């Protein structure tokens, strides 16, 4: 698809299939002034001595420089298309006025809970907790893209004088193309591609509707409330022990967490989930399969992600389950998939948004997304004393579905469960995380010591007489590169690594 000029300096380009799916999901809760799958990332920052003066001005300038580097940050959705305006220094300044915020009072959790659907991304600086919070709609970017984007942002802070200060006269060439275009998917489908796509999506949806989940509050007409998350982070020594145990058994950390999640659903899930096998939708990174240069960091600002639906059999033991999952992780990729992306997303949208009677029980499946070692995409330490001490990623959930994220940062494994407060209490989420931890300890013969449990702000106020969570106050020790061994989060495809990409029940 090409850009078409509608007015002088204004260009419009239709959303492609994958973008259209994400955009429709973005608009699905707009009548409630809410956003499903809104992406967020929280960074707790030690700015070092060089950024102690005029910090707000420096952050704002770096945010503008990031916009110049990634003009996709300025795109605005219009119907089922994206709009680009030719920019100059003044328009970039206006964009910053619409997207950069400083709040001296709010916690990161309060920013996320109160976020509304916006046509542009946002960056918040919260001086009370020394936090930077990035928010974006999912049609614009994915999880690993967010990590690479933030790495570029902190690289700008590291050397602000080296960044171009004004946008190019026409930036369309720097705007990352759709997934289908980046993958080189033909615009005209053959009969073989149509057949492959139809069978692929039929099989995907057949498995996806079987996803298992946990009992939820309320009835079928209960409206969503605030998005929330509970998380547990394990010490570097515990993370090392878990990695070593997985390596000894020749399984990945992702497979171990996946199997532990399945066992947790078998024990704590809905009654029908306890009796059935466990199927979940799991995101995979498609960036390694894209054509150059779209497989590079220069194209962080786009959604290049797919999904698989591995199954865990209830009748198997833990090691058998992990072995089966490893096979699923290694065998999912098919070159035909990349070629057939356009009909795949067409059939997927048809199935996803078709008018039908609501199911008797609203879906409440749990999704697993492993981001792996964050430092592969986003450094923790920069020059001049600039450090990202803590990283947290998530999405805003508006349905009864939950999402489990796993990643390591500074050598510490984090498990984070995203949910909506209308359907789950924080105590339920903690119970789920605790059960996953216990399964891992039992099956891998390790002891996992939580560094800190991330508590809701209100409970933290009560326990510590402060409104900031412990996770944003603790500073972990620096971990050697050797500790960064979360290779288990890498899903080896048939030829290239495919990393779980941090999305919900995604389009593939």
Curated annotation (Swiss-Prot):
Annotated spans, Disordered: 166-188
Stated induction or repression of this protein's expression: Expression is positively regulated by the azaphilone pigments (MonAzPs) gene cluster-specific transcription regulator pigB.
Enzyme Commission code(s) on record: 2.3.1.-
Gene null: resulting phenotype: Produces the angular tricyclic shunt intermediates monasfluol A and monasfluol B that retain the omega-1 alcohol.
The protein's annotated pathway: Secondary metabolite biosynthesis
Keywords: Acyltransferase, Pigment, Transferase
Domain of life where this protein originates: Eukaryota
Gene3D superfamilies linked to this entry: Chloramphenicol acetyltransferase-like domain, Nonribosomal peptide synthetase, condensation domain
Claim: Ribonucleoprotein is one of the keywords in the record: no
Biotech / industrial applications: As colorants, MonAzPs are widely used in various food products for centuries. Moreover, MonAzPs also possess wide-ranging biological activities such as antibacterial activity, preventing hypertension, lowering cholesterol levels, causing hypolipidemic effects, and displaying antiobesity and antitumor activities.
Pfam family, one: PapA_C
GO molecular function, one term: pigment binding
Role played: O-acetyltransferase; part of the gene cluster that mediates the biosynthesis of azaphilone pigments (MonAzPs), a complex mixture of compounds with a common azaphilone skeleton very widely used as food colorants. PigM and pigO are involved in the elimination of the omega-1 alcohol with pigM acting as an O-acetyltransferase that synthesizes the O-11 acetyl intermediate whereas pigO eliminates acetic acid to yield an intermediate with a C10(11) double bond.
Name of the protein in its database record: O-acetyltransferase pigM
Lineage, broadest ranks: Eukaryota, Fungi, Dikarya, Ascomycota, Pezizomycotina
């Amino acid at each position: 698809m090409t850009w078409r000029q509608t007015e002088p300096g204004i260009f419009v380009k239709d959303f492609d299939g994958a973008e259209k799916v994400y955009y429709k999901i973005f608009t699905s809760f707009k009548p409630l002034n809410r956003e499903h799958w809104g992406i967020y990332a929280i960074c707790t920052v030690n700015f070092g001595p060089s950024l102690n003066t005029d910090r707000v001005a420096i952050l704002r300038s770096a945010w503008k420089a990031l916009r110049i580097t990634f003009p996709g940050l300025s795109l605005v959705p219009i119907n089922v298309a994206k709009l680009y305006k030719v920019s100059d220094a003044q328009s970039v300044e206006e964009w910053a006025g619409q997207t950069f915020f400083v709040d001296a009072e709010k916690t990161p959790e309060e920013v996320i809970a109160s976020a509304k659907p916006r046509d542009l991304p946002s960056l918040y600086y919260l001086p009370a907790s020394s936090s930077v919070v990035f928010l974006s709609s999912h049609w614009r970017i994915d999880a690993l893209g967010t990590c690479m984007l933030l790495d570029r942002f902190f690289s700008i802070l590291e050397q602000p004088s080296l960044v171009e200060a004004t946008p190019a006269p026409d930036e369309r060439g720097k705007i990352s193309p759709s997934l289908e275009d980046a993958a080189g998917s033909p615009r005209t489908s053959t009969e073989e591609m149509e057949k492959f796509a139809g069978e692929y999506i039929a099989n995907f949806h057949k498995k996806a509707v079987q996803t298992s989940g946990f009992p939820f509050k309320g009835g079928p007409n209960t409206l969503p409330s605030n998005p929330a998350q509970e998380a547990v982070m394990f010490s570097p020594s515990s993370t090392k022990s878990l990695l070593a145990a997985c390596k000894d058994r020749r399984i990945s950390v992702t497979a171990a967490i996946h199997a532990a999640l399945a066992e947790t659903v078998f024990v704590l899930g809905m009654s029908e989930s306890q009796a059935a096998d466990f199927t979940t939708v799991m995101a995979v990174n498609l960036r390694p399969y894209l054509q150059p240069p779209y497989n590079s960091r220069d194209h962080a600002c786009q959604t290049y992600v797919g999904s698989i639906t591995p199954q865990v059999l209830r009748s198997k033991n833990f090691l058998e389950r992990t072995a089966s999952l490893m096979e699923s992780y290694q065998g999912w990729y098919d070159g035909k998939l990349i070629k057939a992306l356009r009909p795949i997303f067409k059939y997927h949208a048809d199935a996803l948004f078709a008018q039908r009677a609501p199911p008797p029980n609203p879906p409440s499946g749990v999704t697993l997304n492993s981001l792996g070692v964050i430092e592969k995409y986003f450094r923790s330490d920069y020059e001049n004393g600039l450090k990202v001490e803590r990283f947290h990623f998530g999405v805003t959930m508006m349905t009864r579905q939950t999402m489990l994220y796993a990643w390591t940062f500074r050598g510490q494994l984090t498990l984070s469960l995203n949910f909506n407060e209308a359907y789950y209490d924080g105590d339920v989420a903690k119970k789920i995380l605790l059960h996953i931890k216990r399964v891992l300890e039992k099956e891998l013969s390790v002891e996992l010591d939580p560094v800190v449990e991330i508590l809701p702000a209100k409970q933290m106020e009560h326990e510590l007489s402060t409104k900031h969570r412990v996770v944003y106050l603790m500073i972990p020790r620096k971990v050697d590169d050797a500790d960064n061994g979360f290779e288990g989060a890498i899903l080896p495809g048939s030829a290239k690594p495919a990393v779980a990409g941090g999305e919900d029940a995604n389009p593939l």
